[in-house]
């Protein structure tokens, strides 16, 4: 997959260079330079004063990488440092860091913003295959316009002319290239830039029809019926919702009717975002997502201004949420996202996270934003998730430069609720091709949130064993089972429960064998027990937030599965509760 992706990118880069990287195209992008904005949207998003202070010293941190740029800003070496990752490069050229300078405030921060924008114009005013990628252009146009009042409303006429001229050129480029084979969050960001340029720059309102058409086409495909984003990544969901709120804002400030599909998408995505939060206000960790800043999440929810009802279940997004007392469990009950949307996807089907109040207990390991970094591949693997692995094999193939291949063809899920508990029964056939085994996971959370019971079964795959929900899925399951190799014996398996770094754990001898005592940061104690396997405490890491990996522990239940299959029952009991 990565080879074909690289070949496509090589071919596309060559075509783009011929079409856009010439003086004639520079002339095509020319046009009348406007003297002022027709509309100025507000930018409600927070920045970091600490990051702003670092930027005064030309130190930039994006995507887990910090670089100090020692060359003058009006040189190419400043804007294209040799050791920058792709994600870092995108962060620099998107100019979202202008918010950090605004948060710092003062004349020095404003002067630095103008110096850096002018330096960029010296080096990248004409098309460049990297810095003019549609998503980067879209972010840059929106950030320059949205932060107009901070860095160039009071600037001299020469500076203002250069910025307005570049904004016009970048907007015309977006109008010519979109959708440019883009999809997912990158396309939404590019559309946002086109909307800002089209609605805020006088005489560019011709973009409006294109913006409406692109929104209709994109939102109809990428925002699912329950409000989830098709990439199944909570961080991407947050970013897309934020972009859509910005697009709605620029329609409003320009006094143009907001597209109905845009309003509907925001109203559906808002409760889905709440669905993906833990009690600490941050996000669950699935498919490359991070915790994210809870203050930013609150701002997004407030700006969404949606009165949609909260979700109990997300059947299209394919996540399930169990809530009892102050306890919360979120289960990934679906396959990775489809091709074209799975670059950030993980092989974490049927993994779950478990929190109580504001404290996370069981988590997934997190992610790394740079596809070429070895951490990205390692964290995308099944073993970095709180679920089952067989013989250290991924449930979906993990591609080294991002993405997955050969995902489970069948993932089923049933939800049952009573007055006493919520039960989820889910299964996937990702291990059928290699081992002829179906993984079935059952979770029960009691109404008080004192006990989480689970059972993980590895069952020989036979036609109908996946409990498919329809005739078409039954046919798929039967085909998968009939082509599967016979189960072999013995095969080692491991059920992993990665613990949050704030959780302390130790193995103790119990009446029925070894158990694990967990203690949260607040001192609340939980006891983990298991039947059908051997309990071990092992090292793990946590990358749910920015910064270096944080050491932590994982509970691992080991066992072997043979021709007859295997089953392990396990439970987390709050210590004051009766098991």
Ranges and model annotations:
Residues 224, 228-365, 417, 552, ...:
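Carbohydrate-active enzyme catalytic cores, enriched for enzymes
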Residues 93, 318, 350, 384, ...:
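Residues that flank catalytic or metal-binding motifs in active/ligand-binding sites
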Residues 86, 138, 184, 367-579:
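CBM-like, beta-strand-rich accessory domains located in the C-terminal region of large
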Residues 189, 347-349, 383-385:
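Short, solvent-exposed loop/turn segments at the edges of secondary structure
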Residues 1-72:
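Extreme N-terminal leader/anchor segments
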Residues 68-74, 109-114:
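Helix-turn-helix repeat elements of alpha-solenoid scaffolds
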Residues 85-266:
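Aromatic-lined, polymer-binding surfaces characteristic
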Residues 63, 323-327, 357, 391, ...:
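Short strand-coil-strand connectors
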